[in-house]
Amino acid sequence: MALGRALGDAIRASEFGGRVLVAASGGLSHWLPSNDPRDPSVDATKKASLVHGRRDARAFAAAREPRVRAMGGNSEARVNPDWDGWFLEQLVAADAEPVAALGHDGLEEEAGSGGHEIRCWLVGHAAVGLPLVWTSYEAVPEWITGMGIGTTFSVSVYAPTS
């Protein structure tokens, strides 16, 4: 949060203060398989790539894709739509402190190992210093994440007439 506030202060103090777009992105809740080389559930090939890097990124990506696709809908690769909704509500209320108060372990418990990506949202929110006024959210288990968007300005949503 301090990083976001400092970024916002620097932007507002600059000659471009009112003409800067702050964009923050990251996944919402999602539980991914471990990437910790100390974790016994991590297989030897993955452990070696984590410790020593990947010599052949294309081969690694080709081998990884079927595993990722298999995770879609897998109960261990879940999302938490209730938590995602609560998180977005905090940003609408311009009160991210309850989220920050969760700390590392609390955040991981509620939003999963991939939930730490919401820190980007927190930095952007603190930099702008305004509540979100429009949000949209969809849990997408096939992509192993909750997908959300929010803005600090109103958005007209196109609705087909027929």
Where are these regions (language model features)?
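Beta-strand elements within well-structured catalytic alpha/beta cores of enzymes
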Residues: 18-28, 124
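Flexible, D/E/H-enriched segments
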Residues: 1-6, 13, 35-162
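Conserved catalytic-core segments centered on acid/base and nucleophilic motifs
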Residues: 10-11, 23
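Short, conserved secondary-structure transition motifs
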Residues: 28-34
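Nuclease catalytic cores that cleave nucleic-acid phosphodiester bonds
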Residues: 11-18
